[in-house]
């Protein structure tokens, strides 16, 4: 059965998915796992952490590259026909929603649920003077030497 294959217009932008926007959609799906009350609480915390890590790396690598293209006035559009400036606007719009969802999930869902399980996250404003002093000493003796360039 030889049927003719429809010719595809490979210049049609609707055939392509932007790599950066696709990665943000993936972040939304991971965040949805953090919001799923049917999952164990610590798994939800883990998914939230994964979402945050993906976003950090996304901005360090992908957004930095798009910003470079925008800064140098790259006029070449991707196959999806977005310019670097248009892509940045899309990225920031998606990210604003994503970060708001991330913080809402943390503050409104996970922290209260953790608290019910007697797992408390202390904010720096809740630290005692003794805790603050210990942390300063620990940072100076253990962390700073590792992260300080030679």
Please place each PLM-identified region on the residue numbering.
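N-terminal localization/anchoring segments of enzymes in phospholipid and broader phosphate metabolism
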Residues: 1-150
């Amino acid at each position: 059965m030889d049927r003719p294959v429809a010719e595809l217009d490979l210049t049609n932008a609707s055939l392509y998915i932007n790599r950066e926007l696709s990665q943000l959609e993936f972040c939304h799906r991971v965040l949805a796992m953090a919001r799923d009350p049917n999952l164990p609480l610590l798994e939800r915390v883990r998914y939230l952490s994964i979402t945050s890590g993906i976003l950090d790396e996304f901005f360090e690598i992908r957004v930095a590259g798009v910003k470079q293209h925008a800064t140098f006035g790259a006029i070449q559009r991707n196959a999806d026909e977005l310019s670097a400036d248009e892509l940045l606007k899309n990225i920031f719009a998606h990210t604003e929603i994503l970060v708001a969802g991330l913080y809402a999930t943390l503050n409104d869902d996970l922290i209260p649920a953790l608290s019910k399980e007697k797992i408390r996250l202390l904010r720096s404003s809740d630290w005692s003077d003794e805790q603050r002093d210990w942390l300063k000493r620990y940072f100076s003796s253990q962390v700073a030497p590792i992260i300080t360039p030679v």
